């Protein structure tokens, strides 16, 4: 499993904090950020890498998280969540099988961002009754 991470200019500093944290937790992290990229391009780059392997997960950081979330949900087969707390990050993996989260650097601080990332990457899909919902989401794209 690789964690694919990216950020626009507004999210770059927090992205580096999250990236360093995940590397310290022994996760393979692939940073697709390119200087000056808009959140749309960053989100598309993260999603492309996430979709290369079923077990890959993605994190996109900009100022508020909403823009990358809107982009991610337009991509076929991508289930994404905009999160600003640890519980939602963990639960979106368990119940929705989300493969990407977005967050805003002007919404969450460094400590919370680390905990969000940790909850997301350590979350496991529960399957079962939740698969019906995931199938519905996948039919929409």
UniProtKB/Swiss-Prot annotation:
One GO BP: lactose catabolic process via tagatose-6-phosphate
Documented EC number(s): 5.3.1.26
Pfam families: LacAB_rpiB
Entry superkingdom: Bacteria
Biological or metabolic pathway of the protein: Carbohydrate metabolism; D-galactose 6-phosphate degradation; D-tagatose 6-phosphate from D-galactose 6-phosphate: step 1/1
Keywords: Isomerase, Lactose metabolism
Reaction equations catalysed: aldehydo-D-galactose 6-phosphate = keto-D-tagatose 6-phosphate
One GO MF term: ribose-5-phosphate isomerase activity
Matches recorded under Gene3D superfamilies: Sugar-phosphate isomerase, RpiB/LacA/LacB
Subunit relationships: Heteromultimeric protein consisting of LacA and LacB.
Family, per entry: Belongs to the LacAB/RpiB family.
Name by which UniProt lists this protein: Galactose-6-phosphate isomerase subunit LacA 1
UniProt organism field: Streptococcus agalactiae serotype III (strain NEM316)
